[in-house]
Amino acid sequence: MSNSIEAKLQEDLRDALVDYYLGQIVPNSKDFTNLRSTIKNVDDLYDHLLLDTQVSAKVITSRLSLVTQSVQQYINRIALNLEPGLSINQQEATDWEEFANRYGYWAANQQLRMFPEIYVDPTLRLTKTEFFFQLESALNQGKLTDDVAQKAVLGYLNNFEEVSNLEIIAGYQDGIDIENDKTYFVARTRMQPYRYFWRSLDASQRNANSQELYPTAWSEWKAISVPLENVANGIVRPIMMDNRLYISWFEVAEEKETDSDGNIIVSGRYRTKIRLAHLGFDGVWSSGTTLREEVLADQMEEMIAVVDRMEDEPRLALVAFKEMSESWDVVFSYICDSMLIESSNLPTTTHPPKPGDGDKGLSDLDDYGANLVWFYLHETANGGKAEYKQLILYPVIINRDWPIELDKTHQGDFGTVDDFTLNSNYTGDELSLYLQSSSTYKYDFSKSKNIIYGIWKEDANNNRCWLNYKLLTPEDYEPQINATLVMCDKGDVNIITGFSLPNGGVDAGGKIKVTLRVGKKLRDKFQIKQFSQTQYLQFPEASSADVWYIGKQIRLNTLFAKELIGKASRSLDLVLSWETQNSRLEEAILGGAAELIDLDGANGIYFWELFFHMPFMVSWRFNVEQRYEDANRWVKYLFNPFECEDEPALLLGKPPYWNSRPLVDEPFKGYSLTQPSDPDAIAASDPIHYRKAVFNFLTKNIIDQGDMEYRKLQPSARTLARLSYSTASSLLGRRPDVQLTSFWQPLTLEDASYKTDSEIRAIEMQSQPLTFEPVVHDQTMSAVDNDIFMYPMNNELRGLWDRIENRIYNLRHNLTLDGKEINMDLYDSSISPRGLMKQRYQRVVTARNASKMNFKVPNYRFEPMLNRSKSGVETLIQFGSTLLSLLERKDSLSFDAYQMIQSGDLYRFSIDLQQQDIDINKASLEALQVSKQSAQDRYDHFKELYDENISSTEQKVIELQSQAANSLLMAQGMRTAAAALDVIPNIYGLAVGGSHWGAPLNAAAEIIMIKYQADSSKSESLSVSESYRRRRQEWELQYKQAEWEVNSVEQQINLQNMQIKAANKRLEQVEAQQQQAMALLDYFSERFTNESLYTWLISQLSSLYLQAYDAVLSLCLSAEASLLYELNLGEQSFVGGGGWNDLYQGLMAGETLKLALMRMERVYVEQNSRRQEITKTISLKALLGESWPAELNKLKQKTPINFNLEEQIFVEDYQELYQRRIKSVSVSLPMLVGPYEDVCAQLTQTSSSYSTRADLKTVENMLTKRTFADTPHLVRSIQPNQQISLSTGVNDSGLFMLNFDDERFLPFEGSGVDSSWRLQFTNLKQNLDSLNDVILHVKYTAAIGSSTFSQGVRKILANINNDE
């Protein structure tokens, strides 16, 4: 029956079954009672059966395939919530989508889980730190050597040292569940200029049994690329809001003011800014944003930052404060929503006004911020202050007189209470309330002698219940009443306090309603403590005894990095030694004996990378570069199966063979749960997988090393290859026996679901019972455990045994690596000293075989290889130019950044100079003001003297002097009168007498004296008057000079004020320039084309450049090999090994190779002379003679025959020729071939040789078949085992068209005519009865020797013929 008819019948049967199912089964079957309304057509049937009932017969399927597709469809529908009543959680849906809903993905994922060691690749590790990426970049920038590796490791250690001993300044716990929350830390370097970093701790990533944190619980330290030079007190606070990390800080700058005289004075006020920055999802920090800026009277000293989630919309509260006393503080805050918009509808807070609130004028914003959260400072044992913060309920105190309203029918009944206080305190999960009064109760009741006062709680429906109450009588004095409210969650609590009559129920008559805003207090708090030089994280003493973190301490810093740097500068062996890894140099947290470095602690990720991932990656790189000896040497830092029994490290407790602590320390089982499909995570969880990976790598590397030696086709190299394979076989041991008999019994899924794993059950019976935990989805665990499914064979490991066995088999049967037969010398050919020198400097493997007698012949001739090499060299030169431009650009950016940094330093220096200039000017101004005051005092003094002129005392003295002069003149006048009277006789008697004759003269003298006295008095008066006048003139001069001096000093003061203003302006200018320079530096640092980008580009291009150099060098060496092969130039070398210089990033390597190509081209043009072109036809029947019938019989039986084309048959034709090399070989088969019938035969050249010089000794050895040990000018078997397939049997060269201008070498081209061959017919059914001969058409070239050489060859032939 044809396929089309059968397909039509199958489709008709399908349609009939569908119609029957819809028409009979669905309407009549009890199983479809509830489904009849939903299954109406084939589409409904598809939704029910999850099978396409309209599929055509062209679709190839099976029952099992259909069932699998149906189940897959079913689970997909559950994941999409299309199956009523069935659903899976988000994690299960994600796992199903990523790993399980496609068989290919599921199978690959299972392979990753079962055999992670196979897929461990150090270059593809997902959890590399930024420092490790930089180490990789350094290793990729040039030829990988020990010096390069040491430099890269030193760079890694320098980076690690910077973050190993950071000062942690803040932390933020994102939530209130200390067991599972993420905590973010901010730290800074201990030396200026400060650099800030952040990291996180995920407390949920811990071992289920030991409760120890996994190393991956800690993220790496990452730099905060935000300008933080002006951070006040070094305080930076992290916050997590809306799944985004923020940092907040505040900046304080003292305000400067100018007085009325233009002087710059300190105002005592502080410009304060609250700033915020966030980490973008691309890992780039935003520039800082100023949220609030004001000038405050107080200098803020501390800051806290929290997210308040008590409302529907979370609020970010940033509170800067200054502690004024033990009971109150000054705050400066910013409260905003998740969009950073300042909140205006803040919740009402009720608390007492703090001292000074009215004076300070705190806003509602500050009022909310002051009471939302608060902090405590506690004195530590060593005198330091350790701060920790908690959300608390601020104490609420209300003082009020409350009227008592009784039932309205009781008119006139009332009372008052004075000085009533409601206090609250939040402790643990309890809200304690108490009513208190400091005065007596006053009430006047006419009808009721008792009254109830108490505390009620009101729910959302205004229903009230008693918390506590007291029954009072007029005689009672009840100072207080207490009540406790157990809190279940944060939120608002309505409390009602008041009075009621005894029969008034729970309704408070006189009442006041208070809404208390309650926040959950964080009872369990992290604390960052320091003991000596050790900084550690102190977990709290939990209230519950079964909490894992009770009193736990985790070291945060390490001082081990400096020790590592010191060792790395001397030798990498010291860094990676077992002694270093087990050094007890870590100071104990609370004193005591020193501790080992913690591989699983806060710095464990760095120690893992240093002691394991780094040497593994370097050895991996060496293997990729085919430098297997270096790879073996580096992998010994991890695993050395060849170590001596007296190894000193064994005495230190090192386990045999293993040299890396991360591979032998007891791991935290279950770490793989965090990344169940990551082979590195699985291996880190159980390092036996890492040990297997290292073991497999070492074994493969040894095999690869053996393969490299095997390809050299030298006897000694084969010996080394055999040793490598034996070593790898010894490491693997015997191949495990596998039982091929299968006892599998088919099972249904239902039966399989009831099978259990007996071994797991036995382990469970032996284990201690675990604490019951709620069942959650775990993608690492199977839904059903049973023992009917087993792990498959590790084909990768089994392949190593197969590979070794294949290599050993080929060695034992004289085959090449790919299984072809070869003929080899008994001993190696000698290597020239030049070749040995070249071997030391060549980079690629193809250039390491210094002897050009054993190089691999390229596929292409010299001219096409030259063109390809030129193209590759031009590309390499372009790569080098691009690399140089990138290096120049990076250096330019580095120089610009350096200039900017230096400019910043110079600006700071200029600012200091300007400030000193201002201080000098201010001092000069003060001196001028003193001088002005002195001049003003002199002016005032002399002006006062001038205005006063003669004092009253001096005037009185003048008057007295005038009176004295007048008195003296009167006395003199009286004396003159007396003298005149003396002339008159005063005796009257007998004689007249008694007169004095001299009296007139005396009188005259007295008159003269009177005149003298008068003149003298006048002159004295005039003298005094004139002296006073002169004195006044002097005073006038003095006060005028003082006035001029005051004016002059005033001008100088004005000039000095102008200079101070100018200096302040210059200072502002320099500060603005500094800010602009810093902003420009920040722009240069943060822009995309920054220095780090060029560093990355240089790293990537350096790696590409090195690989391009390897590729182009291989092309050039192939071109060189083609040239040497074509022109038979022997051991000449054109491509040197010094083209690449690691010191200069390999620049000019392309130009060096270009010069080598030009030299090769010149040699090719000069020496590519035309050779003799000869064709020789050879009959195997004639060549083999008597043995031909037997050989012909072998051919007819499809058995291969071997024959030789000896040098002698060619020498007999032309004695003056040498260097006979085959150009092409074609075969003619004289036989009858039917129409459309082909010949199927293979011709293989097993060996060949030719002489390179016209040397008679070489010719004699070739003709006499003597040993070739003393024949230096003989080339043997350059490219053995070349083969052609014959199809026509008529001058058949094995090619569709024989083209002597082909870019590729022709089969057998360049080999010697002195050769060995193997011929075989391969078609077992072909009739060869008509075959009677095999004709070879050999076309070869040869060089012409001298006549002397020709005569010598003839003599050798004559001697051979005579001997025969």
Swiss-Prot record:
Highest taxon above the source species: Bacteria
A Pfam family of this chain: TcA_TcB_BD
UniProt keyword terms in alphabetical order: Coiled coil, Secreted, Virulence
Places the protein is found: Secreted
Residue runs in coiled coils: 1025-1080
Post-translational changes noted in the entry: The isolated toxin complex includes 3 peptides starting between residues 768 and 778 of this protein, which might be physiologically relevant.
GO cellular component: extracellular region
Reported consequences of knocking out the gene: Cells with a disrupted yenA1-yenA2-chi2-yenB-yenC1-yenC2 locus are no longer pathogenic in C.zealandica larvae.
Principal subcellular localization: secreted
Subunit composition and interactions: Semipurified toxin complex consists of at least YenA1-YenA2-YenB-YenC1-YenC2-Chi1-Chi2. The Yen-TC:K9 subcomplex is about 26 nm tall and 22 nm in diameter with 5-fold symmetry and 5 copies of YenA1, YenA2, Chi1 and Chi2; the chitinase subunits may be solvent accessible on the exterior the complex. The Yen-TC:K9 subcomplex has no insecticidal activity. The native complex with additional YenB, YenC1 and YenC2 subunits is 16 nm taller and is insecticidal; the toxicity-conferring subunits are present at about 1 copy each.
UniProt function note: Part of an orally active toxin complex (TC) with strong insecticidal effects on larvae of the Coleoptera Costelytra zealandica, Acrossidius tasmania and Adoryphorus couloni and some Lepidoptera larvae. The TC has an endochitinase activity.
This protein's name: Toxin subunit YenA2
Natural source organism: Yersinia entomophaga
Lineage, top ranks: Bacteria, Pseudomonadati, Pseudomonadota, Gammaproteobacteria, Enterobacterales
